[in-house]
From Swiss-Prot:
Pfam families: Rib_5-P_isom_A. Signal peptide: none annotated. Catalyzes the reversible conversion of ribose-5-phosphate to ribulose 5-phosphate. It comes from Chloroflexus aurantiacus (strain ATCC 29366 / DSM 635 / J-10-fl). This is Ribose-5-phosphate isomerase A. Homodimer. One of its GO terms (molecular function) is ribose-5-phosphate isomerase activity. InterPro entries: NagB/RpiA_transferase-like, Ribose-5P_isomerase, Ribose5P_isomerase_typA_subgr, Ribose5P_isomerase_type_A. HAMAP family: Rib_5P_isom_A. Its EC number is 5.3.1.6. The gene is rpiA. It is an enzyme of class 5 (isomerase). The active site is at E110.
Length: 239
């Protein structure tokens, strides 16, 4: 029986996605523990001379700091026409390659970079797979301070429970934009796309953690190795 650890599986998925990186690419650098493996592997290939003229677009201030420490040249969305490939993690993935993201609080920038990308490779271990979004993970929402309790009440009126995300010291968690995060336990979602549209239309919600139709590739590391799933596989897979 294969007993590879979660961290080993994260690294396996990251390595499979990093194999897509080519010289001259603009690379979206995701945020989170799994994406950090990919960033380190990209830096290693860069310093080995395998990747020339690449530049990274970080999805969070934490990612930017790591990339600078590793010597990866950086740019911004304002300075590039498009991102060739983004490699990022996810908190939950359904068989349609729809995602819940935002566990690290970087959902707004992550979504902006993903939307600007020609290809989005999501890297996860098999614990992130779910038959329906919301089954395993709360849905993060970035909200403004003004009226956040009213926003929370509106969410709970739709069903489920809402918690304001706190730091370890008990103070409210703040995003890179200075906003708050509400974590909404809304249960399995029958129609994530419809909910995404509803949340996008609600004033006070800056961004939600539903990523619909953005992932082009999924690399899942499990006991039997890494499985590569693409959008062409949707409708033929289940987990």
């Amino acid at each position: 029986m294969n007993t590879t650890s979660t961290e080993t599986r994260k690294a396996m998925a990251a390595a499979a996605a990093v194999a897509l990186v080519r010289p001259g690419m603009v690379i979206g650098l995701g945020f989170g523990s799994t994406a950090a493996y990919a960033t380190r592997m990209i830096a290693e290939r860069l310093h080995q001379g395998d990747l020339n003229d690449i530049v990274g677009v970080p999805c969070a201030e934490g990612t930017a700091q790591l990339a600078r420490e590793l010597g990866i040249p950086l740019t911004t969305l304002d300075e590039v026409a498009a991102v060739d490939l983004t490699i990022d993690g996810a908190d939950e993935v359904d068989p349609q390659l729809s995602l819940i993201k935002g566990g690290g609080g970087a959902l707004l920038r992550e979504k902006m970079v993903a939307q600007a990308s020609r290809r989005v490779a999501i890297i996860v271990d098999d614990s992130k797979l779910s038959p329906a979004l919301g089954t395993r993970f709360a849905l993060p929402l970035e909200v403004v301070d003004f009226g956040w309790r009213a926003t929370a009440r509106w969410l709970e009126a739709q069903g489920g429970t809402v918690q304001l995300r706190l730091r370890a010291d008990g103070q409210p968690f703040r995003t890179d934009q200075g906003n708050l995060i509400l974590d909404w336990k809304c249960g399995p979602l029958n129609d994530p796309a419809a909910l995404a549209a509803q949340l996008s239309a609600r004033a006070g919600i800056v961004e939600h953690g539903l990523f619909i139709g953005l992932a082009t590739d999924l690399f899942v590391a499990g006991p039997d190795g890494v499985q590569h799933v693409t959008t062409s596989d949707c409708g033929t897979i289940a987990w």
